[in-house]
Each structure stands twice: as C-alpha cells, then as structure tokens.
C-alpha cells in the first residue's frame, strides 16, 4: 500500500512528521505538503500560477500551494505509482463542528476522496505537540484497519483526538458535527506607519455541543470520528423551495 500524507500546517510541522513515522513501517508513505502554514484555506486550488514541488532534506515534498493542491498534484501526475489512499494531519488544533468548512486538513482528505481514494483527516485538540505520540498511535490503528470499513462512496472520516496521553483516552465515539457560535469580532490594529489592518479572531465556542456531537466526545476524553459526505445538498429544503419557486414563476 502507498499512502499520500498531506496537511495544512506545513511540510515542517511536527504533526505531519509524527504521522509519517507512525505509518512508515506499515506502508510506503509519501509526504506532499505546503511549504508554509496554510491553515484555514479550505479546499482552494491555485489557478493563477504554476506550482513548484521541492524535495526537502527529510525526504518530504514541499509545494508552494494549498493542501488541496498537494493532494490533487500528488494523485494526478506528481507521484508514480499513484498512492492508494490519503491521510491528512496531524493538525495541531481542533477541526470540530463548522471548522470542517474552513479546514485545509479536512479539505486535503476531501480532495483525496474526489480522486476516489479512501481518506482520513486527523486533528489533535492542542496547539502544542506534547500528545502527538498518542494521536499518531490512534491514526495508525485506524489506517491499519481501514479495509474493514464499509463506507458509502464519497465519504471522508474526520477524526479529532483529545489532548491527552494515550492511557487517559477513554475510547472512540462515532459523532455528528456540532456547531459553533458566531466567531469573535475581527481585531483592528494600526501598524507603526499608521496603516489600519484587521486580524481574523478566534472561532466561536460550541453552541451545539451536547451528547452525540464531536465537541462533547472530545471534551469527555473520547476520540471523535465523524463521517463527512461530499454531497452538500440539503434535501429536506426541496419541498419548501418548490412551492416558493412556483409562486415566483
């Protein structure tokens, strides 16, 4: 088996190194990751210029593009033979609830699924790497047994791991996405030359984070696994929209 590993924290981030090391003895692993931190870019593709892969001293391939660029290129011309699956992460920071809409980590996995490869996205609930060994162990366990999964087509698994050592993790829970409250207001700043600018502020707290959600599971010390579907059609809205359109036309 050949695994394409990507992320959004960048090719030199500790999370992707930990993930690579955890999987390297069970499969041939090839890392293609952004040359710099590309957190929050979602599934954007670079269309206004060529992309330039660069081989790093650790054997990883760094790309001057987005996480989705990395997977798209890795599965469509850069790598031969083409990898059999895509594993994204390990992200330093949660990708819970609405985070999945912005996450480059999740988007990399989604691009893998677009290209008809099984795909995981792994995130650790910490900006610090202390518990990466536990997260890497869990990632390895899930990837190692992925062939036993009977997932519908066009499904991606988003996995969030609590910031705990392995012995304190209570188990794994299958969860739905929760929802966050509105993000905090952007922070206005003025640079030394008097030019105004804004920092995008932190994400909102969990607004829908009760039992059954990914928020609740990780706060209780469980790994959360959420199956994400690529079809974002809201089928339940069809009836109301049909009658609305009839009135308009």
From Swiss-Prot:
Alphabetized GO MF terms: 3'-nucleotidase activity; 5'-nucleotidase activity; exopolyphosphatase activity; metal ion binding; nucleotide binding
Enzyme Commission number: 3.1.3.5
Cellular component GO terms held in the UniProt record: cytoplasm
Cofactor-binding details, from the entry: Binds 1 divalent metal cation per subunit.
Necessary cofactors: a divalent metal cation
Keyword Phosphoprotein set for record: no
Domain of life: Bacteria
Known catalytic reactions: a ribonucleoside 5'-phosphate + H2O = a ribonucleoside + phosphate
Protein location: Cytoplasm
Positions of a divalent metal cation binding: 8-9, 39, 91
Gene3D superfamilies to which the protein is assigned, alphabetical: Survival protein SurE-like phosphatase/nucleotidase (3.40.1210.10)
Entry keyword set: Cytoplasm, Hydrolase, Metal-binding, Nucleotide-binding
Family according to the record: Belongs to the SurE nucleotidase family.
NCBIfam families: PRK00346.1-3, PRK00346.1-4, surE
Protein name: 5'-nucleotidase SurE
Name of the gene this protein is made from: surE
């Amino acid at each position: 088996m050949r695994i394409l590993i990507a992320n959004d924290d960048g090719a030199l981030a500790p999370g992707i190194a930990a993930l690579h090391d955890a999987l390297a003895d069970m499969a041939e692993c090839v890392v293609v990751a952004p040359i710099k931190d590309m957190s929050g870019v979602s599934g954007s593709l670079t269309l206004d210029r060529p992309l330039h892969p660069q081989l790093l001293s650790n054997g990883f391939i760094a790309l001057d593009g987005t996480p989705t660029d990395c997977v798209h290129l890795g599965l469509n011309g850069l790598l031969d033979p083409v990898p059999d699956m895509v594993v994204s992460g390990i992200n330093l920071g949660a990708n819970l609830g609405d985070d999945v809409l912005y996450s480059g980590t999740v988007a990399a996995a989604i691009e893998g699924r677009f290209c008809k490869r099984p795909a995981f996205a792994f995130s650790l609930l910490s900006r610090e790497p202390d518990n990466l060994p536990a997260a890497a162990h869990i990632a390895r366990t899930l990837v190692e047994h992925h062939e036993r999964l009977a997932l519908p087509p066009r499904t991606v698994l988003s996995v969030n791991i609590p910031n705990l050592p392995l012995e304190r993790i209570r188990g794994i829970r299958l969860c739905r996405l929760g929802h966050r409250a509105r993000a905090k207001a952007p922070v206005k700043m003025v640079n030394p030359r008097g030019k105004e600018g804004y920092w995008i502020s932190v994400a909102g707290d969990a607004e829908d984070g009760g039992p059954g959600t990914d928020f609740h599971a990780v706060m209780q010390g469980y790994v959360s696994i959420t199956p994400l579907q690529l079809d974002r059609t809201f089928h339940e809205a069809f009836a109301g929209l049909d009658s609305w359109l009839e009135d308009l036309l």
